[in-house]
């Protein structure tokens, strides 16, 4: 349903943001 799609999208975005932050913090870009 719509809610599940939104949740999945939010999870994907959050994961991408977290990965980017980890990359910058660890200098592993």
From Swiss-Prot:
Query: What is this protein called in UniProt?
Result: Ranatuerin-2SEa
Domain of life of the organism encoding this protein: Eukaryota
Cystine links in this protein are: 23-29
What's the stated role of this polypeptide?
Answer: Mast cell degranulating peptide. Causes histamine release from rat peritoneal mast cells in vitro. Has antibacterial activity against the Gram-negative bacterium E.coli K12 and Gram-positive bacterium M.luteus NCT C2665.
> What's one GO-annotated cellular component?
extracellular region
What the record says about family reads: Belongs to the frog skin active peptide (FSAP) family. Ranatuerin subfamily.
**Is the Disulfide bond keyword given for this protein?**
yes
Q: Which organism is it from?
A: Lithobates sevosus
What's the chief localization of this chain? secreted
The subcellular location is:
Secreted
Q: Name one Pfam family in it.
A: Antimicrobial_2
Q: Which GO terms describe its biological process?
A: defense response to Gram-negative bacterium; defense response to Gram-positive bacterium; histamine secretion by mast cell; positive regulation of mast cell degranulation
Record's keyword annotation contains GTP-binding: no
């Amino acid at each position: 349903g719509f809610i599940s799609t939104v949740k999945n999208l939010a999870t994907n975005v959050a994961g991408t943001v977290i990965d980017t932050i980890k990359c910058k913090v660890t200098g592993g870009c």
